[in-house]
Amino acid sequence: KKTALALTERKTRYEIIEVLKAHTADEVVKALNRIEKRLGASFYSVFQTITVDNGSEFKDFEALEKAINRVGNRTKIYYCHARSPQERGSNENANLLIRRWLPKGSDFDKILTRDKVKNVEEWINFYPRRLFKGKCSFVLFQEELALL
């Protein structure tokens, strides 16, 4: 059964959403591999750490951390405490935005396509943020990438 992985960059709140074929650890690793390939060397600076919940899809921390484009690790995985979503606050807020377009309980096998996810991702990343005085995450993320 399809699902989605949402990765929130901490500083700019830039959102990356990947479609997963199944809710498994192997699919999450594949998604991180795709993101690492897409971002290239900047992945290692942008996602120095990733905080995840204690779901079974995140159980293989060694595979999640292992880089595919260089020797060693791509990131460091941290697990939040059980029933402590506030430890992943930015990601939880992003999940609320995602749920506007992909409601919980929806049949993701029918509605979850790469195009649909891309549209949701763009809507979130171009949404003006009060936190950033009306700027959007996309512009801020591009500015941060230019500094790397």
Regions found by a protein language model. Give the residues of each.
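Short conserved beta-strand segments at catalytic cores or DNA/RNA-binding microdomains
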Residues: 1-16, 21, 32
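Short, surface-exposed connector motifs at secondary-structure boundaries
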Residues: 12-16, 41-48
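Short, conserved catalytic/metal-binding motifs centered on acidic residues
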Residues: 13, 50-53, 88, 124
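Active-site beta-loop-alpha junctions of metal-dependent nucleic acid enzymes
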Residues: 17-42
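Acidic/histidine-rich, metal-coordinating catalytic segments
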Residues: 43-60, 81-83
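Short, well-ordered secondary-structure micro-motifs
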Residues: 60-63, 90
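Short, surface-exposed basic-aromatic patches at helix termini and helix-loop junctions that form
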Residues: 64-73
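Charged alpha-helix within mobile-element recombinases
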Residues: 74-148
